[in-house]
């Protein structure tokens, strides 16, 4: 009985949510969030030097994007002396949807450890393919460590669901010769 309830009400509501999300992206005529710019390789990327409010029913936070297109304080490409630099890439979880800058896990690590400088390269909607394509830019910051905050809930599907924020992004296809196309 419990399994039937879960399949009928919980599983079907999740399926409906996904369908309506896809429908919303297909019918969107513009980017509902003003934090992103079109990018010919990545599909979209964070804006440079942007400040605005990100609001949904459950939260309202100020968002500041620096000159390097990171939701972070201004950073130099030159490393600080006596600190290891950690670059973190990821999707909306890393970017910090729903939380203030000070509440993001990368900011907490950076604030509570004097031996590390943590740079947050998170971009909402990114997945493994865009992490790979983003890597050349991240390496220009000379990180000692590069971490990927991988979200099992959607990072695999982000490789094939290739439209976000009214922008098309890179996607993968399977072919006889296994490679990224």
What are these regions (language model features)?
Residues 1-7:
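Hydrophobic membrane-insertion alpha-helices, especially the h-region
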Residues 2, 89-90, 148-150:
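Active-site flanking residues adjacent to catalytic metal/cofactor-binding acidic residues
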Residues 6, 94-95, 154:
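Active-site micro-motifs of SAM-dependent methyltransferase domains
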Residues 13-112:
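Membrane/wall-proximal cationic-aromatic binding patches
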Residues 87-89, 119, 146:
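Conserved beta-strand elements of the Class I
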Residues 113-139:
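A conserved hydrophobic secondary-structure block that centers on an alpha-helix together
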């Amino acid at each position: 009985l419990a399994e039937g309830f879960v399949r009928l009400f919980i599983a079907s509501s999740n399926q409906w949510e996904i369908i309506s999300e896809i429908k919303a992206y297909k019918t969107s005529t513009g980017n509902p969030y003003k934090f992103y710019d079109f990018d010919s390789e990545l599909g979209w990327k964070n804006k440079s030097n942007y400040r605005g409010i990100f609001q949904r029913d459950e939260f309202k936070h100020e968002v500041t994007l620096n000159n390097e297109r990171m939701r972070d304080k201004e950073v130099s490409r030159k490393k600080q002396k006596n600190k290891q630099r950690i670059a973190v890439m990821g999707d909306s979880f890393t970017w910090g949807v729903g939380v203030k800058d000070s509440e993001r896990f990368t900011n907490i690590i950076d604030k509570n450890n004097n031996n590390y400088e943590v740079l947050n390269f998170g971009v909402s909607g990114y997945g493994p393919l865009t992490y790979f394509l983003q890597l050349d830019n991240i390496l220009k910051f000379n990180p000692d460590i590069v971490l990927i905050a991988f979200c099992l809930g959607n990072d695999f599907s982000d490789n094939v669901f290739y439209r976000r924020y009214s922008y098309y992004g890179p996607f993968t296809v399977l072919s006889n010769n296994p490679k990224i196309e």
